[in-house]
């Protein structure tokens, strides 16, 4: 019997400790809901795996609408970090690029203003619907990024 834990179990254990006591707020886009629903579930599942609590979930019509909801969550004392979950699919124009760039920029500004992490779990731009379905794990990565940054900023 091997008494030393393998690298996989060490990583899982250290990540679970990392998320302990973290309270997250989710902002979820309803546009492309078939995809963002999967992303939301995966994000919640990963937060629970890491020992974090999803304290609040706000639904917004689209990615462009995320900043105001993120601001409301960031104002709360019971939210340590915000995870933005959305999916922007390429159309006939550059609309997808404009939406993602402006939303990402404003979410970054809010993170700096409130001194709390805001992680992007937004797939796109320049993504087809099949591409977006393959990238639902962006939500999982965003949850992990929010928790890691929150923990690394503690005590500074």
Where are these regions (language model features)?
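Short, well-ordered secondary-structure micro-motifs
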Residues: 37-39, 67-71, 93-97, 130-134
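Short beta->alpha junction loops
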Residues: 55-64, 124
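C-terminal binding/interaction regions
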Residues: 96-97, 101-156
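Glycine-rich phosphate-binding loop
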Residues: 69-106
